[in-house]
Amino acid sequence: MWHEARKHERKLRGMMVDYKKRAERRREYYEKIKKDPAQFLQVHGRACKVHLDSAVALAAESPVNMMPWQGDTNNMIDRFDVRAHLDHIPDYTPPLLTTISPEQESDERKCNYERYRGLVQNDFAGISEEQCLYQIYIDELYGGLQRPSEDEKKKLAEKKASIGYTYEDSTVAEVEKVAEKPEEEESPAEEESNSDEDEVIPDIDVEVDVDELNQEQVADLNKQATTYGMADGDFVRMLRKDKEEAEAIKHAKALEEEKAMYSGRRSRRQRREFREKRLRGRKISPPSYARRDSPTYDPYKRSPSESSSESRSRSRSPSPGREEKITFITSFGGSDEEAAAAAAAAAASGAAPGKPPAPPQTGGPAPGRNASTRRRSSSSSASRTSSSRSSSRSSSRSRRGYYRSGRHARSRSRSWSRSRSRSRRYSRSRSRGRRHSDGGSRDGHRYSRSPARRGGYVPRRRSRSRSRSGDRYKRGARGPRHHSSSHSRSSWSLSPSRSRSVTRSGSRSQSRSRSRSQSHSQSQSHSPSPPREKLTRPAASPAVGEKLKKTEPAAGKETGAAKPKLTPQERLKLRMQKALNRQFKADKKAAQEKMIQQEHERQEREDELRAMARKIRMKERERREKEREEWERQYSRQSRSPSPRYSREYSSSRRRSRSRSRSPHYRH
């Protein structure tokens, strides 16, 4: 079967090759015989017999039927021909009053150019009418001379150069008739064409190359053309136009051949290179569907300060106009420079730092945002209170500033707290706060105070809280833990509240803690304490500043930069990769299950074969036992004491049966 397929394939391949070669030969043949369509029209006149029968021809050509036309005996005509009555043809005299329009005149000049172009060239080259007719006769008789193409000429020239010998018979001497001309009217193009020809008579269809003519030859050509109804300068101008048209046709033909050469599925790269080469010099304008920036406008009428502070772009990259200024901690210890920097940051954000907040409405958002604290941390909390007990969940994301080293950390904390409040209200507040720390250090404890505001008036109360942040990977570079007590005011209350916290922190900047607190006057809460929390107000003691400077780089080494946000293309790529992994795992699992199933089926078939072989052996053994019992009963009936010969036969048959039963073929 395979050999037949190979034979059929070889046959098809041979047919394809034959068709391709035949198409190439056909194309070459048509390329050889292809000519200019203007040269297809030919008028032939020759003597021929009208009547094939000789008797009828003689009768038709007898003087009875033939008569001279216009008295010329050399020109005989049939007397039944209608042209016999045209004995007088008057000369045509155009009317003097009829004027020809410029369009008609130009058309007539073009027609004269097409009619008498060959005659003008012959007059310019000094070729007589007999020579021209003889050349036409030679062309019709022998089918024209195939002039070698330019590629063949180049190949022949390369061969001549490689051999180092000039063939004298490759060119023919110039025509004697041209050499005997009294005036040097022959153009260089005509000389080259004459030298290339193998015949004595040059090719009549070769046109004059206009670019190689000098001014005298151009004037002579135009003068020769005026006798044939053309205006002065028409002939050379139309010759140049014809040459440009021929060049354009040649260029278009070359393009078509190049396109045909690049046809097919495997030539996409060549077609692309050809298209790029053609469009290389052009300037391409951007398409109409290119992306344009959307217009930005304010849909509502707002005050300028409110619209500028609250309208934000949705783009993730910050615009250069609203880029916030980054302030760095340069010193610790309550210097005037820090206060000036804080004041400048507050002024740049566009809000007064000491502006009192407006009283909140019940169940509405709390207005008034401190813009100077907005850059440090943002927290949103929603609290619901029913019958003096409220459960609130707040999720806060605090983004700390940059240190000098360029490292930053993001700390996310979620805290669930239950608080007990004296007043029943339902409030939802969003706050952005800024922590300021001051105070001294007392045997490892750090005290910090931060002014804060809350969405409603809450009586001053003292709370103690302990927070722990666990570190999964503890490093012993700075000691495993340190205790700090801090007195802080909650960031959104009008009346300050103090909280003392003992924090245990490691070297991890992102910590999550869950806390539940139930307090009337005291509350215990677990709150996240990031190790690299930046405090903008300077501490009272420089020892705390030194300790911060030492602990901050150690924490920054472990955290590293925040994870960049993925673009939609990267997310789609990641999703596709996950889907491919899942599909690969599923395919692998299916293949393993299929292999296990095949192994199980093979094991079952082997078990069935073993069971069948065991049954066959048991049946064979039972049959042999029955035969032996029958033989024993039969011989015991014949004689109780068997003869020695029988005993030998019996013992030998018994041995044979035992050897068969113990043969390895039946052993299991």
Curated annotation (Swiss-Prot):
Record note on quaternary structure: Probably interacts with CLK4.
Intracellular or extracellular location(s): Nucleus
Tissue note: Highly expressed in brain. Expressed at intermediate level in lung and liver. In brain, it is expressed in the hippocampus, cerebellum and olfactory bulb.
Query: Modified residue Phosphoserine is at which positions?
Result: 101, 285, 294, 331, 335, 541
Q: Where is the composition biased (Low complexity)?
A: 340-353, 378-395, 487-510, 518-527, 636-645
Q: How is it modified after translation?
A: Phosphorylated in vitro by CLK4.
Which of UniProt's keywords are assigned here?
Answer: Coiled coil, mRNA processing, mRNA splicing, Nucleus, Phosphoprotein
From which domain of life does this come? Eukaryota
Q: What is this protein called?
A: CLK4-associating serine/arginine rich protein
Q: Where is the composition biased (Basic residues)?
A: 265-283, 396-435, 475-486, 653-668
Q: Where is the signal peptide?
A: none
Which ranges are annotated Acidic residues under compositional bias?
182-214
Using the UniProt record, give the first listed, main subcellular location.
nucleus
Q: Where is the composition biased (Basic and acidic residues)?
A: 290-313, 436-446, 584-611, 619-635
Q: Which SMART domains match?
A: DRY_EERY (SM01141)
The function of this protein is: Probably functions as an alternative splicing regulator. May regulate the mRNA splicing of genes such as CLK1. May act by regulating members of the CLK kinase family.
Family recorded in the similarity comment: Belongs to the splicing factor SR family.
Q: Which stretches does the entry tag as region Disordered?
A: 173-232, 252-668
Q: Does the keyword Nucleus apply?
A: yes
Parts of the chain that traverse the membrane: none
**Which residue positions does Phosphothreonine occur at?**
327, 567
